[in-house]
Amino acid sequence: MNAHVPPESVSAAEDSWTVAGRTFRSRLIVGTGKYKDYATNAAAAKAAGAEIVTVAVRRVNLTDPTQPLLIDYVKPTEFTYLPNTAGCFTGEDAVRTLRLAREAGGWDLVKLEVLSDPKTLYPDMEETLRSLKLLVSEGFQVMVYCSDDPVYARKLEEAGAVAIMPLGAPIGSGLGIQNRVNLRIIVENAGVPVLVDAGVGTASDAAIGMELGCDAILMNTAIAEAKDPIRMARAMKHAVIAGREAYLAGRMQKRLYADPSSPLGGLI
């Protein structure tokens, strides 16, 4: 049975997904960067219907009371915080950052990303895998940003990742999902949730990710850099729902030739 498809008896209203023992109804995760202010960020997260928000521990103010605090706007009582290691280019930096996050907020469900270079922000998969093993040994529940390589996705799951998060395209590029085949293979082989992480630019990109069978979509720039972030957040919410519904419904088979909607027999 495909772990990413609920039993047929489950209605759309009851459809949910679970990661590290925590169950969520919304399949849209949003970031907390690039917004003009925290108030806009909070409004967008609510418009998206998100239950999880990612937080770049090294960039977002969580503790300095002399500056605006994210927690005063995007409240931890309303959202599940997912600390991440954005901006880390070595495994050591990533592990250190998440240790600090756990000390500061008690978070053990975290997102690991170890970047290879500033130009592409592609994940360094060797460093990612090495860091994952260390974090798992320390009791972290790790969701992992990774390449769209099915082999590495399997290795990450075997090493203890609680979710696999392959990029759709480079972070912040808005190019949409570039390799649907690999993403589909990752989904079919995975025993943990698979989330598109990075590259979504507009609503159709989010819908495609869900149509491919992904459990959820994570995005930041697509909403934050839209001309109207709140409206785009709403659009993304509906796109994720539509894509999920289409995946569960099962699309028609593609055909080379036409197949009339109305029978041709018995015509006047």
From Swiss-Prot:
Keyword GTP-binding appears in the UniProt entry: no
Coiled-coil ranges (or none): none
Cited SUPFAM superfamilies: ThiG-like
Top EC category: transferase
Entry EC no(s): 2.8.1.10
Residues involved in 1-deoxy-D-xylulose 5-phosphate binding: G172, A198, G199, N220, T221
Record key words, sorted: Cytoplasm, Schiff base, Thiamine biosynthesis, Transferase
CDD domains from the UniProt entry: ThiG
Record-annotated active site: K111 (schiff-base intermediate with dxp)
Pathway: Cofactor biosynthesis; thiamine diphosphate biosynthesis
Catalytic activity: [ThiS sulfur-carrier protein]-C-terminal-Gly-aminoethanethioate + 2-iminoacetate + 1-deoxy-D-xylulose 5-phosphate = [ThiS sulfur-carrier protein]-C-terminal Gly-Gly + 2-[(2R,5Z)-2-carboxy-4-methylthiazol-5(2H)-ylidene]ethyl phosphate + 2 H2O + H(+)
GO molecular function, one term: thiazole synthase activity
GO BP annotations listed: thiamine diphosphate biosynthetic process
Cell compartments where the protein resides: Cytoplasm
A GO term from the CC aspect: cytoplasm
UniProt function note: Catalyzes the rearrangement of 1-deoxy-D-xylulose 5-phosphate (DXP) to produce the thiazole phosphate moiety of thiamine. Sulfur is provided by the thiocarboxylate moiety of the carrier protein ThiS. In vitro, sulfur can be provided by H(2)S.
Quaternary structure and interacting proteins, as annotated: Homotetramer. Forms heterodimers with either ThiH or ThiS.
Family per similarity comment: Belongs to the ThiG family.
The name this protein goes by in its record: Thiazole synthase
Protein source organism: Caulobacter sp. (strain K31)
